[in-house]
Structure formats: structure tokens, C-alpha cells
Amino acid sequence: MMITKQSYQKFALMRVFVFSLSAFIFNTTEFVPVALLSDIAKSFEMESATVGLMITAYAWVVSLGSLPLMLLSAKIERKRLLLFLFALFILSHILSALAWNFWVLLISRMGIAFAHSIFWSITASLVIRVAPRNKKQQALGLLALGSSLAMILGLPLGRIIGQILDWRSTFGVIGGVATLIMLLMWKLLPHLPSRNAGTLASVPVLMKRPLLVGIYLLVIMVISGHFTTYSYIEPFIIQISQFSPDITTLMLFVFGLAGVAGSFLFGRLYAKNSRKFIAFAMVLVICPQLLLFVFKNLEWVIFLQIFLWGIGITSLTIALQMRVLQLAPDATDVASAIFSGSYNVGIGSGALFGSIVIHQLGLEYIGFVGGALGLLALFWLRFITIKFKKT
């Protein structure tokens, strides 16, 4: 019996590991344009702020597609669905690597965004399902760790590959790694029937839960603020702080490394007081943005700010996702799809706001505007915390 139990634990952890790798590759490709923005803009003879709208387009496809695509695929067996999503993901990256103009690149990114829409709608509930019985919360933390490693390894490595070869090679390598993950998924994942996915009828039911709706609005607000600044952090560091490209790469690495600390803090502290944890994480996201320009030329201070910012955004993202799952246990996939959609509305809006700020005010102001949006989100958190204190 002990051997059987050990085998179960081993395979369950390996399956969680596959999902963590999947999160790594999806998050790497979503945000790697941030690390390659200047190179992509230069190759197409465009401005960084204009190319940055590619981030907005990607995010808005995800935000608009998450719920309807999840509902359309609600009855499909989950392993088969995941393999299809990875096939689409890989083919789209081949097109990205071959893109002969910006519009072809944009179209290829839309294919990736469609895969992303469904992947993040179903993954949180699936990783909890395949996890060992007493490791459900830790499994969600490992999923977030995969996302954090995308920032630690994916973005810096993507930037290094882009600098040594070119940005097209970065997308090609991502497609290659995704192929290996797809093979692991095919080999290790069990048959996963759709379960508690919810239906279209679940949507109005969820929308009648005011705290859940409040959390979705909070996600849009705080993520909009975050991505107003983060979408253009690479050109800010190079042009405003005037640090070298190597320092810029190292700062992206530090941001991702901080995400591991954020995942750890979530696992240790969230259950003790979820409301205070979310508020503290938001403060860590907001303050570095507001102070970014103030300390723009102090290298060690910028490193510290980026580290704290990375801790904040990672722990905040996991905490908000966990809160959504807690508030909607009867329709986890629908709730996750709306969460993913809300998150990507924030990404798209933030990248758009950042582009507008750069064109109207200047690159140096992105931190002030992003931080101000974060402060509005903090006030909203305070309001819903008081309003729904017993929920």
C-alpha cells in the first residue's frame, strides 16, 4: 500500500510539474515582447510605443475570447483540449519566427492569444485536480512558480537570444520548448473529463455575487496600472535611466526572481489573512511605480524597487485567483475564464494607457500614471472589504 501511495504522489507531482512548465512557456511568450520591444520596433522601422500596442491587441483577444471559447470547449475532455491548444501555440510561433512584416507578427500573436484564452481558463482547476490530495494550495503555488520562472529565465533568456541572434529566433526557441512540453503532457496526463466547468447559465449566477464582481473590477484596475508601467519598462530603463542593455536584462531577471519569493509568501501567509495579504501585495506593486522616475539614476534603488514590485505582482495575482476560486467553487472554469478575461483587459488597457502617456506626456511619466491607477484600485479594495466584510 505504501508503494502504491508513493507512486501516486510521484505521478501527481510530475503532472503538477507539467502544468508548471506549461505556465512557464505561456507566460514567457505573453510577456517576451516587453523584453524585445526595441528590437522588434527597430526591425520594422517603427516606434516602441506603436509596437507596444501588440501587447494590447494580444491582451484584448484573450479578454474577449476567454469566456466564449471556454464555453464552446466546456464539454471537451481536458487532455485532448490541452494538446490541441499546444499544437495551435506551436504553429503560431513558427509564423512569428517567419513574420515578414509587423502585421504578420500581429496575426501570429492572435493565434497564440486564442490558445492562451482557453489555457488559463481551465488550468487552475486542472492543476488542483491532478495534485496530491493534501497539496492542493501548494499546487496552485507551483503553477504560479512556473509563471514566475518565465520572468526569471524566460524573459532574460528571450532577450539574450534576441540580442545574440535576433528576436525571431526567440519565438522559434519558444515554439521548440513548447513541443517538448506537449510531449510530456501527452505522456503524463491522465484522461481528464470536463468537471464543474459551468455553462452559459453560470455567468448570470456568478454576476449576482457582488464580492466576486468586485474582485474582477479590482483585477482590471490594478493590472491596468501595473502594465501602464511594466509594458514599457525596457525602454524606460534604457532611455530614461540610461542603463546598459546588460543591466536591463539583469533587472528583468531580478523582477522574475522576486516572483519566486512572491509565490513562497503566498503559500505561507495567504491563508492566515487573505484580505491583508492582498492589500500588502498591492502596496508593493504601487509604490515602486510611483518612485520609479524619482530614483531613475540610482541603480541599486531601481533594483530594489523592481524586486519588491516583482514580489507584489506575483503574490497579488495568485491571491486574487485563489479568491475567485473560493468564491465560485460551483463553476470554476467559468469563474477562471472571467478572471483571465479581466486580467487581460487590464494588460491591454495598461499597455494602451502607457502608449498614450508616452505620446502625450513622455516616457518618464509612465510610473506616475501606473501608480495613480494602482492607488485607485487600492481605494476600491478598501471599499469592497468594508462593504462585504462577512463574505
Curated annotation (Swiss-Prot):
GO terms for cellular component: plasma membrane. InterPro entries: MFS, MFS_dom, MFS_Efflux_Transporters, MFS_trans_sf, Sugar_effux_transptr_put. Keywords: Cell inner membrane, Cell membrane, Membrane, Sugar transport, Transmembrane, Transmembrane helix, Transport. Its main location: membrane. It is a multi-pass membrane protein. It is found in: Cell inner membrane. Involved in the efflux of sugars. The physiological role may be the reduction of the intracellular concentration of toxic sugars or sugar metabolites. Belongs to the major facilitator superfamily. SotB (TC 2.A.1.2) family. HAMAP family: MFS_SotB. This is Probable sugar efflux transporter. It comes from Helicobacter pylori (strain P12).
